Each structure stands twice: as C-alpha cells, then as structure tokens.
Amino acid sequence: DGGIGSVPFPLVADLTRGISLAYGVLSEEGESYYPQGVAMRATFIVDTKGIVRHQLVNDEPLGRNIDEVIRVLDALQFFEENGQVCPAGWTSGQTGMSNTPSGVASYLSEHAEKL
C-alpha cells in the first residue's frame, strides 16, 4: 500500500510558509545565511501533553547533532517517568534531582567532585 503507516500526528506541507513563520524559523534578510524566506533547519521536541519543551534552530553554517537531540529526548522521558529534572551535562543512566532548593543542594553535594 505504501506510505509510512500509522503515526499519531499529522504530516503537513508548509506551502504558504505560515507554519515556518509561526515557529519563528523563516529566515529574514540580513539575519541569516539562508536566503530570505527560506525555513531554517529546526527541531522541536513536544511532550506527551503537546507542549514544546525544547527547540533548536540552526542557521545554515551550523550543523545539527543527533546525539544531542537523543539526549534531550532521553531527559524529557526521564523527567516524565521519574519526576526529577536533569542537571547540566546529564546523560541517560545518570541520576536526576528534585527541582527544589534542598534537592539541588543535595545533588550538588553528592556530585561535587565530578562538577
């Protein structure tokens, strides 16, 4: 039959550039290495509630890093499953921390030698 199978979100084309404009990825003259009116490369990570939790917009000379996108996805999934936030430099398999003053203090004291 072809196609990509069942996906839980719509696939769209942006023929009028309205989506690119709404998401702020449409290049403007003098603000980007892209020609005016071209959509810059962008990644938006949306949580299970439909909230954009991370966005990354790359101008033409900057390459994307799929490993960082995967790390951010892992961090979001970790938060959704455990309710703990992921500190700077966090990678999958590491501990998170409570986003309270005492939780941050506890995490920092436990990991002081590594920081």
Language-model segments: residues:
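Chalcogenol-based redox active-site neighborhoods
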Residues: D1-L115
